[in-house]
UniProtKB/Swiss-Prot annotation:
Belongs to the eukaryotic ribosomal protein eS6 family. This is Small ribosomal subunit protein eS6. The keyword Ribonucleoprotein applies. One of its GO terms (biological process) is translation. Keywords: Ribonucleoprotein, Ribosomal protein. Coiled coil: none annotated. Signal peptide: none annotated. It comes from Pyrobaculum aerophilum (strain ATCC 51768 / DSM 7523 / JCM 9630 / CIP 104966 / NBRC 100827 / IM2). NCBIfam families: PRK04290.1-2. GO terms for cellular component: ribonucleoprotein complex; ribosome. GO terms for molecular function: structural constituent of ribosome. PANTHER family: 40S RIBOSOMAL PROTEIN S6. InterPro entries: Ribosomal_eS6, Ribosomal_eS6_arc, Ribosomal_eS6_CS. The lineage of its organism: Archaea, Thermoproteota, Thermoprotei, Thermoproteales, Thermoproteaceae.
Length: 148
């Protein structure tokens, strides 16, 4: 019985929201790979997405905290010699390090799934994850400042 934390990012507002996903919805994520897209209708109980919106899987992390790596096939956990992200940010150019990563496929040992909302091309409505009160206040002040 898998349980995931889905971190859903909204490119229109720049905000992210975290959801807890349990069975039977969690079963639909098993076997998906980084870059796969799902129809946004499957999250209708958690968040209201615009018609035609999709969800693209961008990554995740395992129970031990190892990030999913798009270059490692399958639902495995292995060490790679990393020279850059994801999973390792070298302090100097050319440095490499042996790092533990997860494969690019979601399994029941994945705890967190990162995803982004993909809006239809003709969508012009408000963002699915709205701006918070602080951001709205900043926008309001920015609009008033040039008028003075």
């Amino acid at each position: 019985m898998p349980t995931f934390k889905l971190v859903l990012s909204d490119p229109m507002s720049g905000k992210a929201r975290q959801f807890e996903i349990k069975d039977p919805l969690a079963q639909r994520f098993i076997g998906l790979k980084i870059g796969d897209e799902l129809d946004g209708v499957i999250l209708k109980d958690l968040i209201e997405l615009p018609k035609g919106a999709k969800i693209r899987i961008t990554g995740g992390s395992g129970i031990e905290g190892a990030p999913m790596h798009p270059g490692v096939p399958g639902p495995v956990k292995k060490y790679i010699l990393a020279d850059g992200p994801p999973g390792y940010w070298p302090p100097k150019k050319g440095m490499k390090k042996k790092k533990l990563v997860r494969g690019n496929t979601i399994s029941d040992s994945i705890v967190q799934i990162n995803a982004v909302i993909v809006y239809p091309k003709d969508y012009t409505g408000p963002p699915a994850i709205p701006l918070g009160a602080k951001e709205l206040e900043k926008e309001k002040k920015a609009e008033e400042a040039p008028a003075q």
